[in-house]
Amino acid sequence: MSTLLHIDSSVRAVSNTNPDHNSISKSIALRFIETWKQHRPQDEYIYRDVGVNPPDFINQDWVGAVFTPDDKRTPEQKERLALSDKLIDEVSAADVIVISSPMYNYGMPAQLKAWFDQIVRINKTFDFDLSRGDFPLQPILSGKTLITVTSSGEFGFEKGGVREGSGHLAPHLRTLSKYLGVDTMYEIVSEYQEFGDDRHRVSVANAKDRAECLASELSLSTTDSLLKSDSVGSDLGITP
């Protein structure tokens, strides 16, 4: 049995009275999840909608608690870190992680960044050793597969695209993924939302098809090297 951790971050719901307000990223991720569950109903499923129920932002007291040795933390400091501990436990338990995110102002939503800030924590998800020279940080967790589902109003943020360098969502997710223990990463992308034309409709349809295909492939391969390889998948493909 595997554990699937699903994180949504759009402030919108999957289904609204006005369908124009439906979350695209959540709907694509849901296609992946539903397909996965069809193939692997026995797996543990953990879900958090950080867009609707955002984690607390870290603050000075949080940082102080993190850098206080475990045996010297006050009850208040332990309570301050309780949510962080819980979120880290969920990531640690996961074999497969699905993160859906819209692009807000060319980056990730603040709520998703808050989730990462609660998780990327010294001596929990990374350690620090200056003997490593200019790269003292090293992830602690490993062996996980990440599927990111992103949606954007514009297009062409990929390498060589017309907006290369202006989209910070996907690069940020790739950088932070190693602190979740990710060895293998797949990206599913939907674009053109602001244009509302055929390009957008085709992009969403293709993303949902990719999500379903990828979920089928991975859910049937949880015991082989497909989930445990050291490579990174393309943004639309299913092969790492």
Swiss-Prot record:
Annotated FMN binding sites: S10, S23, I24, S25
TM helices/strands, residue ranges: none
Cofactor annotation comment: Binds 1 FMN per subunit.
Cysteine pairs bridged by disulfides in the record: none
E.C. designation(s): 1.6.5.-, 1.7.1.17
Annotated catalysed reactions: 2 a quinone + NADH + H(+) = 2 a 1,4-benzosemiquinone + NAD(+); N,N-dimethyl-1,4-phenylenediamine + anthranilate + 2 NAD(+) = 2-(4-dimethylaminophenyl)diazenylbenzoate + 2 NADH + 2 H(+)
Names of required cofactors: FMN
An annotated Gene Ontology molecular function: electron transfer activity
Keyword set includes Cell division: no
Alphabetical UniProt keywords: Flavoprotein, FMN, NAD, Oxidoreductase
Highest rank taxon of the organism: Bacteria
Enzyme class, spelled out: oxidoreductase
Cross-referenced InterPro entries: Flavodoxin_fold (IPR003680), Flavoprotein-like_sf (IPR029039), FMN-dep_NADH:Q_OxRdtase_AzoR1 (IPR050104), NADH:quinone_OxRdtase_FMN_depd (IPR023048)
Pfam family, one: Flavodoxin_2
Entry's family note: Belongs to the azoreductase type 1 family.
Main function: Quinone reductase that provides resistance to thiol-specific stress caused by electrophilic quinones.
Assembly: Homodimer.
Protein name listed in UniProt: FMN-dependent NADH:quinone oxidoreductase 2
Lineage: Bacteria, Pseudomonadati, Pseudomonadota, Gammaproteobacteria, Alteromonadales
Gene: azoR2
